Amino acid sequence: MFTGIINSIGNIESRNIDEIQISTDNDLYHGLDSGTSISVDGTCLTLRDYNDDFLNFQVSEETFSRTVAKEYEKDVKTNLELPATLTTFLSGHIVQGHVDNTSVVTNIVENDNNLWTYHFKNTDTRYIVDKGSVTINGISLTVVNPDKE
């Protein structure tokens, strides 16, 4: 599980039909063991291996179909987060990393709070409630005035 508080930015080095390779300058990610869960843009991926400064993930067709990973190409930036531990501050909210769908940004109001409006396609919105939490690209966000339309 994760918290939705990003602790590193990754860079897509390559993507093919069933694999993603990511680099990061953050030493926390260097030398991790195979099998470690890592949140990549909010999707829980299992590290296949770490070599030559790259995180390598095997990715299923299901994951590509439901997540932003289908849009990855070389040099795209990704949000990374290591899994929460028993001593991790839960500054965001509990995030499983099991992604159901993607959303589309429909409006951005730039002010002190930068209000972003999203449209969730084909999503059961009854679970999106005012002052509840959602995770977008791995970032824990608070819902304000959800419009169920």
Short names for language-model regions:
Residues M1-E149:
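Conserved loop->alpha-helix
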